[in-house]
Amino acid sequence: MKIYKDIITGDEMFADTYKMKLVDEVIYEVYGKLITRQGDDIKLEGANASAEEADEGTDITSESGVDVVLNHRLQECFAFGDKKSYTLYLKDYMKKVLAKLEEKSPDQVDVFKTNMNKAMKDILGRFKELQFFTGESMDCDGMVALVEYREINGDSVPVLMFFKHGLDEEKC
């Protein structure tokens, strides 16, 4: 199994246990599921409750959300009220990633510069449909993951987007 961590904060962002796809060599799209967790029990949204065991009515806390977000303790970030504030963050973040890339993988710099501009124009065009999540440290200097709900086979599926070059792969 591989864990993907933010190269700036070291926060765990996601693992390769989810369905994922690399887009334009710069963005990982990770496909999540809406779940509800009660204590240690996980229930998929839309599951048939009548086919489950009888509930004993205990006071167990529950949390609902996207599995990737809950499992990796991502935190929703409300820092970007408009496109301009997100664009400013992105320019600053990309400079940090570029510096790390030049140091660790200089062969990837051209791929990053070329494809990232194209990908960002596409993402900024859908800005109003996005949610933003940081790693567990809630450090906005690091990666801010994007979540967009897409219609796939008649279902609304949460798709998380992470910048490939802003991640370190760690084998477990």
UniProtKB/Swiss-Prot annotation:
GO molecular function annotations of the record: calcium ion binding; guanyl-nucleotide exchange factor activity; protein kinase activator activity
Subcellular location: Cytoplasm
Key words, A-Z: Calcium, Cytoplasm
GO BP term (any one): cellular response to gamma radiation
Sequence ranges assigned to domain TCTP in this UniProt record: 1-172
First-listed, main subcellular location of the protein, grouped into a coarse class: cytoplasm
Pfam families: TCTP
Record Gene3D superfamilies: Metal Binding Protein, Guanine Nucleotide Exchange Factor, Chain A
Entry keyword annotation includes Secreted: no
UniProt xrefs under InterPro entries: Mss4-like_sf (IPR011057), Mss4/transl-control_tumour (IPR011323), TCTP (IPR034737), Translation_control_tumour_CS (IPR018103), Translational_control_tumour_p (IPR018105)
UniProt superkingdom: Eukaryota
Gene Ontology cellular component terms for the protein in this record: cytoplasmic microtubule; nucleus; polytene chromosome
Membership in a protein family: Belongs to the TCTP family.
Protein name as it appears in the record: Translationally-controlled tumor protein homolog
Organism for this UniProt entry: Drosophila yakuba (Fruit fly)
Gene: Tctp
